[in-house]
């Protein structure tokens, strides 16, 4: 295939040098912000402070022009996309909110998070021409609720 769309899945430990190399090679990233739900409590103990600060650089990837797609890697974490969007936007764990924001420099806007979940994922699977068929009806307007409310959005119909 002439139009390969190579990607790295589980790129939460990619450092800035590796991210620059991904950009140079046109490699996309399929990442799981929701992993912070569990990892936020253990990442510094397991990796040390320096490596912790060089992990979960998903917004850095995005800002450098790397195509970033979101996934949950269910059943590792719950499949609920609103939990993932919440974590990408807040940098907080739903399980351990008392631990605060993981990295304030790596927070996505709502528009960016939705792009990573929709348009980019369609592109990654060569399905960008199909995205007009999908819809969901939810109990809250995601554009008019607080970041904290996003994690509680319920799908009413799909």
Predicted regions and their residues:
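Intrinsically disordered, low-complexity linker/tail regions enriched
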Residues: 148-150
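His/Asp/Glu-enriched, well-ordered alpha-helical/loop segment
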Residues: 1-6, 11, 16-142, 153-158
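Active-site and NAD+-binding cores of ADP-ribose-processing enzymes
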Residues: 145
């Amino acid at each position: 295939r002439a139009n390969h769309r190579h990607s790295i899945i589980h790129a939460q430990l990619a450092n800035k040098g590796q991210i620059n190399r991904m950009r140079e090679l046109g490699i996309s990233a399929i990442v799981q912000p929701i992993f912070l739900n569990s990892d936020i409590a253990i990442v510094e103990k397991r990796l040390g402070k320096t490596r912790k600060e060089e992990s979960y650089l998903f917004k850095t990837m995005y800002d450098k022009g790397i195509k970033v797609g979101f996934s949950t890697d269910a059943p590792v974490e719950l499949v609920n996309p609103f939990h993932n969007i919440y974590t990408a936007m807040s940098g907080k764990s739903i399980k351990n909110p008392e631990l605060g924001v993981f990295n304030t420099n790596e927070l996505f806007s709502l528009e960016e998070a939705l792009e990573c979940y929709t348009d980019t994922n369609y592109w990654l699977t060569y399905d960008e021409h199909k995205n007009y068929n999908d819809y969901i009806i939810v109990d809250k307007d995601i554009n008019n609720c607080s970041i904290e409310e996003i994690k509680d959005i319920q799908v009413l119909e799909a």
